[in-house]
Amino acid sequence: MESKLNLEEIKRYLEEHQEEFYQVSDAIYEYAELAKEEIKSSAALEHLLEAFGFTVERPYKELPTAFRAVKGKGELSIGYLCEYDALPGLWQDPVPYQKGNGNSGHGCGHNLLGVGSAAAGIALAHLAEKNEWNIRVVVYGTPAEERYSGKTIMANTGAFRDLTVCLGWHPLDHNDCGMTKFKAISSFEIIFHGKKAHACNCPELGRSALDACELMNVGCNYLREHVNRDCYFHYCYTNGGEVPNIVLDQASVWYLARAYTFEEMKALRERILDVARGAALMTGTQMEYRISSENPDNRLNFTLSKLAYECMEEIGAPEFTEEDKNWSREVASHVDLPEADGEFDNEVTKPMEDRVVKDNGSSDISDVSQIVPTVNLYMTCYGRKTPNHSWAISAQTKTHAAHVGMLRAAKVLALMGSRLACESNLVEEAEKEFSHPLSL
């Protein structure tokens, strides 16, 4: 009975304030600020939380665009995670076909993610105040997920250790209750140092750092055949020179290496670095490398995933309009992927302890999951099989359908928080499982 009353109050409260949440999400869409530059975006979320009675600490943990917002007091501390950084080159006018200007845009839906998490925290804090629950609601602003792994930086400087449990979500083209395994990842740059020379008159006097990069990349592409099939790596040049008639004395390439365990990722990175050392030897150059970030694989929590499923079922599927569907279908018609049909996925698969979904991607929420019991949900906000990190996502993150999905996420996360506040056994089970994590 109590859960039913909490559910109705959460729905009523969030729907009463939904226009405020939509406006902030749309504003962050327009700001479209890149990692570590989210000044307006973080301020918008901070002001929203302050308007609902949260005390906001900013900047937080050495990051100017990070924050920590708190409301309530108690030993039980329930955390929510906001993201709000955009991606380069993915600006999209709000039309269902590709029309951008080359600027940054929200091709991963973080304008929705940040506001959805903040709204969940606001709703739970309201319910706690109304029912006089002895809990603390903490909303973390975690910038720079896309490039610098902001949560990793924050975790390494002491963040998240005040939480009992942490609840996260991400807008996607389907629903998931959090039994998704992310890969460990390392971001690192390899810099080669050689000798300059005229590329035509006296190239024999030079030692080409660019040639070293080229040979390294060729070697690494041959390496792909000889690593575990679950291992991925990708690269791009960060310095390839400005003119072709100079033998470059410095060139660099940026690599990402991924694997399903932290140990396997580190072994993969070392093999890539061995190839780089070989390229330096072949070209008579020197090699150095800089690791900018590394994230572990995430620690799953079946107790929290079960809770997420139950709350999703209680909230019910989002109601997308025919106009929503037409917009999504129009976007899909301009995406060269047969499986992107523009339909909305309303199914929710019941989580099972022995059925883990392997995701080829990575997330800095994995760092949080190593500190405190954590779950990360997916919520349908746009059409099925829409390719992530593309204009087609940007075209759908400022729509009615996106708002509907975001508000549903807020309802689910707030309801999860209310049940954790009322059912101490859930917290105990989540903590026990955290001490003995599931393995693949």
Residue ranges and their predicted role:
Residues 57-60, 145, 178-182, 355-359:
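Short Gly/Pro-enriched turn/cap motifs at secondary-structure boundaries
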Residues 79-81, 193, 376-380:
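Non-cysteine beta-strand/loop elements that form the S-adenosyl-L-methionine
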Residues 214-440:
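Metal-dependent amide/peptide-bond hydrolase catalytic core
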Residues 4-5, 23-27, 98-103, 192-200, ...:
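A short small-residue
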